[in-house]
UniProtKB/Swiss-Prot annotation:
EC id: 3.4.24.-
Residues annotated to bind Zn(2+) 2: D147, H150
Recorded name of the encoding gene: mepA
Protein name in UniProt: Penicillin-insensitive murein endopeptidase
InterPro entries: Hedgehog_sig/DD-Pept_Zn-bd_sf, Peptidase_M74
Cofactor(s) needed: Zn(2+)
Disulfide-linked positions: C44-C265, C187-C235, C216-C223
Lineage: superkingdom: Bacteria
Region (Disordered): 228-265
Amino acid sequence: MNKTAIALLALLASSASLAATPWQKITQPVPGSAQSIGSFSNGCIVGADTLPIQSEHYQVMRTDQRRYFGHPDLVMFIQRLSSQVSNLGMGTVLIGDMGMPAGGRFNGGHASHQTGLDVDIFLQLPKTRWTSAQLLRPQALDLVSRDGKHVVSTLWKPEIFSLIKLAAQDKDVTRIFVNPAIKQQLCLDAGTDRDWLRKVRPWFQHRAHMHVRLRCPADSLECEDQPLPPPGDGCGAELQSWFAPPKPGTTKPEKKTPPPLPPSCQALLDEHVI
């Protein structure tokens, strides 16, 4: 399947319905020991933690949408990364969407973020903390040129390279999704220390933020991990294929019905949603 078709499928999956999903009716984490269940794009979470809104090292955006819940491992990762960034004097980490209180499907914007192991982080590190108004209506900084072939040189900063590298070097991180042009710039800037680049994967959009994904926790027995990324730094032919023009004859894929929920997630919905 070519990349245009994949992009259309991802769009359909992330915005299949603008109506509220049953998961949005669950307003508090489900009590219990933390368990990520199912896959990143078809799952849920029991025992989610709430990311503390107040921190000297990070700020949480769009708190009115209440998407600041996740597995305790995700909360600890955010605290760990933002502390590293702060100690290096790089600025304040801006946290976007994590997941809903019980995970599950969004009504739009995300196909994944369902098991409490995904977080979006802006690719800007303000030296001055944002106001409440800025956090509620954040202005994304598009780092990619209009033609999508490279980053905007005046906007690309060494601190952003370091932010992505620090995240990729974290032991719990398995993937970081960024725009292909951003991946390309990372490849150019990386020098000889390149092992971490394997985790950084090119993906559609992601022009102003990175999407960080953690591995399944060892004690979440119903959590489904993705296969590891292909060996190597991912800076060769695979990356260049993202810049090739779409093949002629691309057709819009049919809208697909979401797959059945994992039984444990369906049972959770049955118990907690009237």
